[in-house]
Amino acid sequence: MQAKAIAKYVRISPLKVNFICKEIRGKQVDEALAILKFTPKKGARILEKVLNSAIANAEHNFGLNREDLFVSQAYANNAPVMKRWRPKAKGMAYPILKRSSHVGVVVEEREL
């Protein structure tokens, strides 16, 4: 049985979050939470909230046991990009892309 949680339109680049997603993929949920707690990145705080939500969804909606859960998927997909302009020399302007993400975590029950 799978339970998932998604945080949409999070104002952080997907590249930065996917770097941390790779660390927790396939880990037991308590181990993944410990890794996220001691990772000094903004993306880790976001992933921690989404993972806690996925765990709560698994326990409440499906009655799954927390000790049997592991992170089967952790991902950050592209969301809409805000475009801003930076003034440059000789009256020119360069674009600044402020990227955002859709962060998702799927937890599954470990098969024995």
Curated annotation (Swiss-Prot):
Q: Which Gene3D superfamilies match?
A: Ribosomal protein L22/L17 (3.90.470.10)
Which Pfam families would you find in this protein's record? Ribosomal_L22 (PF00237)
Listed A to Z, the keywords are: Ribonucleoprotein, Ribosomal protein, RNA-binding, rRNA-binding
One of the entry's Gene Ontology molecular-function terms is: structural constituent of ribosome
Q: Which GO terms describe its cellular component?
A: cytosolic large ribosomal subunit
Q: Which domain of life is it from?
A: Bacteria
Biological process terms in GO annotation: translation
Keyword Lyase recorded: no
Q: Which family does it belong to?
A: Belongs to the universal ribosomal protein uL22 family.
What functional role does this protein have? Answer: This protein binds specifically to 23S rRNA; its binding is stimulated by other ribosomal proteins, e.g. L4, L17, and L20. It is important during the early stages of 50S assembly. It makes multiple contacts with different domains of the 23S rRNA in the assembled 50S subunit and ribosome. The globular domain of the protein is located near the polypeptide exit tunnel on the outside of the subunit, while an extended beta-hairpin is found that lines the wall of the exit tunnel in the center of the 70S ribosome.
Q: How does it assemble?
A: Part of the 50S ribosomal subunit.
Give the protein's recorded name: Large ribosomal subunit protein uL22
Origin organism is Finegoldia magna (strain ATCC 29328 / DSM 20472 / WAL 2508) (Peptostreptococcus magnus)
